[in-house]
Structures are given as C-alpha cells and as structure tokens.
Curated annotation (Swiss-Prot):
Subcellular location: Cytoplasm
Keyword Cytoplasm part of the UniProt annotation: yes
SUPFAM superfamilies: Small protein B (SmpB)
Protein name as catalogued: SsrA-binding protein
Native source species: Mycoplasmoides gallisepticum (strain R(low / passage 15 / clone 2))
NCBIfam families: PRK05422.1, smpB
Similarity comment: family membership: Belongs to the SmpB family.
Stated role: Required for rescue of stalled ribosomes mediated by trans-translation. Binds to transfer-messenger RNA (tmRNA), required for stable association of tmRNA with ribosomes. tmRNA and SmpB together mimic tRNA shape, replacing the anticodon stem-loop with SmpB. tmRNA is encoded by the ssrA gene; the 2 termini fold to resemble tRNA(Ala) and it encodes a 'tag peptide', a short internal open reading frame. During trans-translation Ala-aminoacylated tmRNA acts like a tRNA, entering the A-site of stalled ribosomes, displacing the stalled mRNA.
PROSITE patterns: SSRP (PS01317)
Any single GO CC term annotated in Swiss-Prot or TrEMBL for this entry: cytosol
Amino acid sequence: MRLLVNNKKAKYNYELLDKYEAGISLSGNEVKSLALHHGKLDDSYVIIRKNEAYLLNLLIPKYKFDTSKVLNETRTRKLLLHKSEILKIDLIKKQHSLVIIPYQIYFVNNKIKVSIYLARPKKRYDKRQTIKEREINKKIRKY
C-alpha cells in the first residue's frame, strides 16, 4: 500500500466509525497527478444517489504534462463498491444520522483505492477534549 493523499482534518472534525474500501473511476491524467501526490481530500464527502456512490469535491489538479482538454478539477467521481455494500452503508447512515467521508487515497496492486468512513461529526467540546488528550500524551512521552 502506497499512500497518495490523506484527509488531515478527518480525525479532528469527525469520530470515525466503520471503514470501507472502494475503487474510484478516474481518467489517465488524474491517475498520473495522484501518483505525484497531488490532490486534496479536506472538503470532500461521499453521497449515495440511485444506489450508486459518488465522491464530491475531491480536488485533483491538472497533470502538468497534460495537453488534452481541461476537466473540472473537483468533478464528481464515481466510487466502485458492490451494491450490497452501498445498500448497507446507506441504511446505517440513515439510521444513525452519520456522514460518509473519504480518509485516504492509496495504491494497492496498481489500483487506486479510497478508504471511506462512516463518521459522526464532533461537537466543539469533543474537539477540545481531543486537544487536551493529545497534550497530555505529549507530556507523558516527554518524561
């Protein structure tokens, strides 16, 4: 597994619950751009429409050696999941009022995969608690 892009804000803003791995439909130039570690997952999210999963707001900048037509850098991209997985994710999401966020994009056996999580947004006091715990752990490691 070779990590390409990571969502740095995910652990701070969300409580991550269930993990799923999905393929992603990309053009060749987008793959080349991601292979150079260009991309941003910070504001992206997953929606389920008509029993298909889509990744929105994933920023993949234009590959610098690309001479073809310009695609929208934040276009909607289809996620490749089994229908049973999509139905299961959608059911859990609706029952527990969760969101689906992408956490990482990585290579596995020359295929680009996206790890998505069912997550619960953190409240402001939860974020403060996370910061306090992190500072305490730093002090403990220091001594």
